[in-house]
Design a protein with these regions (language model features):
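Eukaryote-specific detector of the first structured module of a protein
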Residues: 1-39
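EF-hand and EF-hand-like Ca2+-sensor regions
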Residues: 38-158
Length: 158
């Protein structure tokens, strides 16, 4: 996996493209994310600035309520069997539903990098752990944390 794919700017670009730009027009518009758009559109750069202001250096609890709600909904959707744990199979399904990935081993490697010993004992990732990882994905400006792997292998948007 290319390490440049996990830098903060690329991670935020991924969030815009694969999580919020519903109609894939390259913008977050009123249809996608009404509360951020002052001119009717939110570019990736504008979204990055908003994320930087609202999320960098913050915990999940400090995120704005609408973002916390969106993250919780994302987890609920990913936990397909509703057992309160995000398993490897559910993680794989989440990853391949967003983008074509040639090698499942890349997804599996990302999942293993997310897990703590406690996660392994439990058999998956809990909602609170997912929240922590998501906060790290958006809120940590470097590429050193486990959270950078939350969405599996990322494309490089550079």
């Amino acid at each position: 996996m290319a390490s440049g794919c996990y830098d903060w700017g690329n991670r935020v670009h991924f969030v815009v493209k694969h999580l919020y730009d519903i109609d894939n027009n390259g913008y977050l518009d009123s249809h996608d994310f009404e509360c951020l758009a002052l001119d009717g559109h939110v570019t990736v750069e504008e979204f990055k600035q908003a994320v930087q202001n609202l999320c960098v250096g913050k915990t999940f609890e400090q995120f704005p309520q609408p973002l916390k709600h969106a993250i919780n909904c994302k987890y609920t959707t990913a936990d397909a069997n509703g057992d309160g744990l995000l398993s490897l199979d559910e993680f794989r399904l989440e990853c391949i539903s967003r983008q074509a990935i040639r090698d499942l081993d890349e997804i599996d490697d990302c999942y293993q990098r997310l897990l703590t010993d406690e996660d392994r004992k439990r058999g998956g990732i809990t909602l609170s752990r997912y929240q922590e990882l998501f906060a790290e994905f958006l809120g940590c400006p470097d590429d050193s944390g486990q959270g950078i792997f939350l969405f599996g292998p990322l494309p490089d948007y550079a």
